[in-house]
Amino acid sequence: MAAAAPPAGPGLYSDIGKKARDLLYRDYHTDQKFTLTTYAANGAAITVAGTKKNESIFSEIQSQVKNNNVSVDVKATSDSKLITTFTVHDLGTPGLKGILSIPFPYQKSAKAEVQYLHPHAGLNAIVGLNANPLVSFSGVFGTGAFAVGTDVAFDTATGDFTKYNAGLSHTTPDLTAALLLNNKGDSLAASYYHKVSKTSAVGAELAHSFSSNENTLTFGTQHALDELTTVKARFNNFGMASALIQHEFRPKSLVTISTEVDTKAIDKSSKVGLSLVLKP
């Protein structure tokens, strides 16, 4: 089978290094998670989710209604928060998306967001809807093969930049490499993702902190045992080893079992996580 072509555009800033991050960190859990999604007669999606971590339990219920290019999400959480999000796709022009998020009872945390995807650019702007808002902007320029971008946030209340990051990436049909400068220039991370075959991929990330002069090196791999079952493993230079197996026992319904072991303290009990996602 021929390899798929790289994406037509550079995507958003959050897409830089995403393939390596997903391979190394996505779906690894050390807690218990349960998610159930059903659909009402009017097409509304209703999702109930619960997470148990240590002795604490967190739950939420979310409803999503779509009508043409407009969607409305309402989410209620067990800590008495209600968040309503309005999303409009292709807002006046293809590739332009508008998002309005209104939390309750913390209305001062409301924010408006605009995203624009172009074959040679990906832009994202967020502004808080209060008297002294936090303003965020990220931009990526280039193509699906090579992209460079920046991500900044400015607090109008203090007049300070709370975030300024930069990144670049190179993508081919089978390989993605990225370099990110994060934490106001304090940390530098290089990542690599390689699809070595139709069923297997490997990835690595090297992160350096300038303030602590500490390096973190993480290796990972994933392999599809068959069309429904995937296994993953990772290891870092601090001796932390993790593995998971994920099985799609029915369309869109997944069970994931993961474990984490400190190989430098093997006498300590390992951590085990379980995730169950049910969709009709």
Curated annotation (Swiss-Prot):
It is found in: Mitochondrion outer membrane. Gene3D superfamilies: Porin (2.40.160.10). GO terms for cellular component: mitochondrial outer membrane; pore complex. GO terms for molecular function: porin activity; voltage-gated monoatomic anion channel activity. The gene is VDAC2. InterPro entries: Porin_dom_sf (IPR023614), Porin_Euk (IPR001925), Porin_Euk/Tom40 (IPR027246). CDD domains: Porin3_VDAC. The lineage of its organism: Eukaryota, Viridiplantae, Streptophyta, Embryophyta, Tracheophyta. It comes from Oryza sativa subsp. japonica. Belongs to the eukaryotic mitochondrial porin (TC 1.B.8.1) family. Induction: Not induced by osmotic stress. Forms a channel through the mitochondrial outer membrane that allows diffusion of small hydrophilic molecules. The channel adopts an open conformation at low or zero membrane potential and a closed conformation at potentials above 30-40 mV. The open state has a weak anion selectivity whereas the closed state is cation-selective. Expressed in roots, stems, leaves, palea, lemma and pollen. Consists mainly of membrane-spanning sided beta-sheets. The keyword Ubl conjugation does not apply. This is Mitochondrial outer membrane protein porin 2. Keywords: Ion transport, Membrane, Mitochondrion, Mitochondrion outer membrane, Porin, Transmembrane, Transmembrane beta strand, Transport.
